[in-house]
Amino acid sequence: MRRATYAFALLAILVLGVVASGCIGGGTTTPTQTSPATQPTTTQTPTQTETQAVECGSGKVVIWHAMQPNELEVFQSLAEEYMALCPEVEIVFEQKPNLEDALKAAIPTGQGPDLFIWAHDWIGKFAEAGLLEPIDEYVTEDLLNEFAPMAQDAMQYKGHYYALPFAAETVAIIYNKEMVSEPPKTFDEMKAIMEKYYDPANEKYGIAWPINAYFISAIAQAFGGYYFDDKTEQPGLDKPETIEGFKFFFTEIWPYMAPTGDYNTQQSIFLEGRAPMMVNGPWSINDVKKAGINFGVVPLPPIIKDGKEYWPRPYGGVKLIYFAAGIKNKDAAWKFAKWLTTSEESIKTLALELGYIPVLTKVLDDPEIKNDPVIYGFGQAVQHAYLMPKSPKMSAVWGGVDGAINEILQDPQNADIEGILKKYQQEILNNMQG
């Protein structure tokens, strides 16, 4: 997910333009074609194991989404499996290309769906606007423990649960196996690889790494700093640990990179074989495969400093199935959503067919998942990710962080990084208050 969704957030993402973020599907993808508005599914024969475990509701459950056609196909297939197990329930998917606007218009008038699918970045603003239905009565400690910690955090806002998680994404190192025989296990090993391949005279570089708030969050937050504290709802650019992270990036990594930090340029450098490694997310894998690169995926390695180990903490996003306020069939919707997000076979299907990174912890130990280098590699990276903030106030932070980065990039070697970050800290605070 790049942060077009986070500026949408962002990352990202943020993934939506890649400028400030990485993207998160469901929330990260913009459909390239519109599916029929309403798509009920058909049924197929259930397996005996599933029949013994499933909880069934009855009636219709309507799910709004803005998925890509290939994503929708897989979700419909899973819904068909569920309806075969539960013949009294009907799962209906409705395509809404402008999903946010559609939800904001429909839910207050009682015309919204039961469920909708998007990334976790909406949970704060939608909860604040009264557009979500709490599911506290259904959520148990045992259920929570089935999910990775980041996913547990993503599904709640200010003490209430509003959604269930089914996938995550973050950035990791994608490396060219023809150039890197053993991926780096520490930052020192990573730096040695960068030094080996850095040859700017021949337009070859040590690493490809897009430069924006989302992508460098891993290092900016590695030493305990942060852009924004979701609990206190305060920015942290002026924290010593954040300043240390920025200084580390621009003194230890930037010198081995091409001088242009935009996403497309950095990705092209790796795809053309002009860098041994790239920092990117699962959304980039199709391009890597098309380039014919023999690649692997591993988490960004820990930085060893003063005898301590500091893991890079890139922002991560979680894909959720939300419960809409005014839900018409809450019991049936809960039972389907719980099945979808906790069934090992369902989550494996999403992972193996769509490349979704599981947050159902028991699936990460599945042999098929472990043998998939992309899914397993990003899955390990998710364990070190820092959940992208959920507070609506985060919207004021992205621009400030990118502003600081752009000012540093004017002269990275001589920039007053501490002074610049403190300047933009105050700018963010002013924007939050104004």
Curated annotation (Swiss-Prot):
CDD domains (alphabetical): PBP2_Maltodextrin
Gene3D superfamilies reported in the protein's UniProt record: Periplasmic binding protein-like II
GO BP of this protein: maltodextrin transmembrane transport; maltose transport
UniProt entry tagged with the keyword Metal-binding: no
Example GO molecular function: maltose binding
Superkingdom field: Archaea
GO cellular component annotations of the record: ATP-binding cassette (ABC) transporter complex, substrate-binding subunit-containing
Keyword annotations: Signal, Sugar transport, Transport
Signal sequence segment: 1-20
Listed Low complexity bias regions: 29-52
A Pfam entry, by short name: SBP_bac_8
Keyword Transport applies: yes
Region (Disordered): 28-52
Similarity annotation: Belongs to the bacterial solute-binding protein 1 family.
Known role: Involved in an abc transport system for maltotriose. Binds maltotriose much more tightly than maltose.
Protein name: Maltotriose-binding protein
Taxonomic source organism: Pyrococcus furiosus (strain ATCC 43587 / DSM 3638 / JCM 8422 / Vc1)
